[in-house]
Amino acid sequence: QPQASWYLLLAQQPDPHLTVGDTHYADTTDPTVQWKHHVTYRRQKEFATVLRNVPTYAIWDDHDYGPNNSDGTAKGKERSLAGWKQVWGNPTLGTTDTPGAFFKFSHGDVDFFMVDSRYHRSPDKVPDDDEKRMLGDAQFAWLLDGLRNSTARFKVIVSGSTLNHSKVDGWRIYTFSRHRVFDAIKKHRISGVMYMSG
């Protein structure tokens, strides 16, 4: 079916364009199934036009990473990451020591921190204490270091997981991780921080 809403996006002449999770609903780490979903998505004429004309950056969420509400225990997550690297033209993902789909890019006076809220995530149902993680310690350190060293006027943290008070599948049920981000921004007096989610 035609997806004319993509033309509404193009009419705004965006630069850049971000897809913030659940770009498809494969709900598996099986690379063959994921690949079919990625190809189907790109065959959509309107979306293909966006990709050809607008710099596009992408982060995943549960459905394009693995099963619904999946986390760092997902079997085959390494295959998901390998496939993600093949289909999206993001900058280098993760770090030398920490795998994942997270990365940073800059546009004008804005630094975007695309965080991976799946690869190192603790299961939703474990106790909501100071052992429960949304990003994992290494990725959190990467984020904090990036925010502290950024000279951009605005720093945008981008994640497929919502920051609001929903008690389903978002930062709200990761109290320690959520407040660790807030507290670090306050402690280090980092200005211009915003949060974006899909």
Predicted regions and their residues:
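Metal-dependent phosphoester/phosphodiester hydrolase catalytic core
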Residues: Q1-G198
